[in-house]
Design a protein with these regions (language model features):
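Catalytic active-site module of serine/aspartate enzymes centered on a nucleophile-bearing elbow/loop
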Residues: 280-326
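The conserved beta1-alpha1 loop
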Residues: 64-68, 134, 159, 258
């Protein structure tokens, strides 16, 4: 995560600081917290919670996507278009984001992974799985891979969070309370019926036109901002889960880093390189013109993410052949 969003939001005076409560906003505002209709994918009941996902059945392994903070699965639109002729995929919305329902629960990384695993099972999407995570979603992808309960072909980390980033980076540490405050401000702003500031959602404009319009409508609702606050407050616990986890050294890992994130945090590149160093079979690409959000939402950057998926699949196949011949 970066400070770019927090800087651009004008977070000085929020409804939270004024002591607002949901009850004080009224019934009309509460209705804005309901799950939106018009979902582009399928809804699946998982333990009583409606979860939305984009699902495609194709050849090759199944690519499993984990979205960035507050983002819907449609943030991957360009990537999904790119890989649809080669792979199956599951791109799901976490509780409270996109078109998924929300029960207000804080979940551990393991519990989020269990929701994903149930979606894979219910929709009969076969292993092996290539896990791909953007931003905070990278923590969840790494956690899923480290659990060792599924056949994992590889891991793709796109400007991913690092489990030690708040320890090793003062910029990330300082940004965390600003990010929480910013997301809280956006929650109250949208709950009261006001649109988010343009700068907060401007990267959505890089998506295909129809998805950009749909994304803007989603982010005018308070639910994703509430979910973002919850996930920020759970971030430390997710990191702690990963500190005690181990990834196989033979697992192919592709890391795709946004070069512009380095501008605000001199430690970012070091942390990204550290993610790649977790495997003996790794690839690290830095996209100089990409920022933290458009690295998946802009078509040219998304093509590089698709290439990272291809690299991971090819090296997973090579690793499997090597293991069989040993």
């Amino acid at each position: 995560m970066t400070t770019r969003l927090a800087r651009g939001l004008g977070i000085g005076a929020s409804a939270i600081a004024a002591g607002a409560t949901v009850a004080a906003v009224g019934a009309t505002a509460l209705s804005r917290l309901s799950r939106p209709s018009g979902e582009p994918g399928v809804l699946t009941n998982v333990n009583g919670l409606p979860l939305h996902a984009l699902i495609h059945r194709g050849d090759g392994p199944t690519v499993v996507f984990e979205n960035g903070l507050a983002c819907a699965c449609t943030e991957w639109s360009w990537v999904l278009r790119d890989i649809a002729d080669r792979y199956s995929y599951l791109a799901a919305d976490r509780p409270g984001c996109g078109w998924s329902g929300d029960d207000g629960r804080r979940r551990s990384a393991r519990e989020i992974n269990e929701l994903t695993a149930q979606l894979l099972t219910q929709h009969d999407l076969p292993a092996p799985y290539v896990l791909i995570g953007h931003s905070i979603g990278g923590l969840l992808a790494m956690s899923f891979a480290a659990a060792g309960s599924h056949d994992i072909a590889g891991l793709v980390l796109v400007d991913s969070s690092h489990p030690d980033q708040l320890v090793r980076s003062s910029a990330q540490r300082d940004a965390m309370p600003m990010a929480e405050h910013a997301m809280g401000s956006l929650f109250w702003r949208t709950l009261s019926g006001r649109k988010p500031s343009r700068v907060a959602v401007s990267d959505l404009d890089d998506l295909p036109e129809h998805e950009a319009a749909r994304g803007h409508r989603l982010m005018e609702r308070p639910a994703p901002w509430r979910a973002a606050v919850r996930e920020i407050r759970t971030f430390d616990a997710w990191c702690e889960e990963l500190r005690t986890a181990t990834l196989p050294r033979s697992l192919p890992i592709a890391v795709v880093t946004a070069g512009k994130t380095d501008v605000g945090d001199s430690k970012h590149g070091e942390l990204q390189a550290d993610l790649a160093a977790a495997s003996d079979v790794s690839r690290h690409v830095v996209l100089a013109e990409a920022d933290h959000d458009n690295i998946v939402m802009r078509a040219d950057h998304a093509a590089e993410v698709g290439a990272a998926i291809d690299w991971t699949v090819s090296h997973s196949t090579a690793q499997a052949r090597k293991a069989r011949s040993a």
